[in-house]
Amino acid sequence: MDAATNVKDVITVKQGLAGRLRLNRPRALHSLNRQMVRDMANALIEWRDDPDVRIILIDHTEGRGFCAGGDVVGISQDVDGHEAAARAFFFDEYRLNHLEYTYAKPGVAFMDGITMGGGVGIACPCRYRVATERTILAMPETTIGIFPDVGAGRYLSRLRGRLAQFLALTGARLDGAECLRLRLATHYLPSDRLEEAKERIIAQPFRTQAVLDELSEEFIPEARIMGNLAKIDRYFESDRLEDILDGLDAGAADGDDWARAEAATIRAKSPMACKVTLKLLVESPYQLHFVDEMRMEFGIMVRLIHHPDFKEGVRALLIDKDNQPQWRPTNPQVIGDRDVEAFFAPLPVEEQWRPFDF
């Protein structure tokens, strides 16, 4: 709730034959807080058996972002004084992600603008994911000392080649055309056609696929990332951070400016978070169901938010904004396999994440 205006941060409303989830926190780029994820989950639960709701639409009310992720500044502050609140945010957020993933009614996410972190988490479970010329999608969590969560281990590890490792380590930003080509989006619409698409879907949800097909852009811009696939597969072949950096350094020494830039990007991230991320991408394909993925991610997250890199990353990027994080440790070589594996140990049964029990 915005105390100044008494306006809710997410608007949940039935309209026509649709249930609408409208993110409404523009001054924070619609970043998610605990009340928002609880409100969205409660609405979805209410609409599960409502015959008047045939489809779910997820979008934002105004501004340049669909959803910039979770409210990590608030979470980092909670870790010190209200640790239970920090855990509760991820517990509830992952419940929303799982509820969407298993929801019987189709969903449409309009990823118009910045779509990062938690924004990816509420968009990717939807059957229809609409990108535009304004879409900027990324999972930049290693910048703040954590890892791509909200089911990203599952979504990223299903991409071709070594794209998962590249995107997760670097936090590289994808535009709408790249999202479409990589199948993170199902459709690419000009932003000036979105309102027409929503109106037609609300009126005739059974024609959602046809409506999006009819309004899709005929001429899609080039997906620039496709030109770097061979380099991504070569340089990011290993599951060891040290090997990846050594390979990029060797490429840079041979005059590859792309390799030089990506090596510098990764070295600016938390070494611990990067190593945990690579381990996640190894383990995620072995999680048979989405519930298993979310349970694993919760166990990792509730430990990693207590590592000093999380608070330091949030400070450097979002509070002081000096972009000079002091990681602990700074050298990935001193982080052993056992250090990383400790984050993946199962939590005690009473502390484990659980989905909604219907």
Model region roles, listed by residue range:
Residues L245-G251, W258-G299, I305, D309-K311:
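Substrate-recognition/cap regions that form aromatic- and gly/pro-loop-enriched pockets
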Residues H60-R95, T143-G145:
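Glycine- (often His-adjacent) and acidic-residue-rich active-site loop
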Residues E100-I144, F166-A172, G176, H187:
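Glycine-rich beta-to-alpha active-site loop
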Residues I58, D71, I122-A123, E178-C179, ...:
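Hydrophobic/aromatic residues within transmembrane alpha-helices
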Residues I300, P308, E312-F358:
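C-terminal amphipathic alpha-helical interaction region
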Residues L189-K269:
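Amphipathic alpha-helical blocks and their helix-capping loop/short-beta junctions
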Residues M1-D59, H98, F356-F358:
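Conserved CoA-thioester-binding segment of acyl-CoA-metabolizing enzymes
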Residues G151-T208:
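Contiguous mid-protein beta-loop-alpha structural module that forms a pocket-lining wall or clamp
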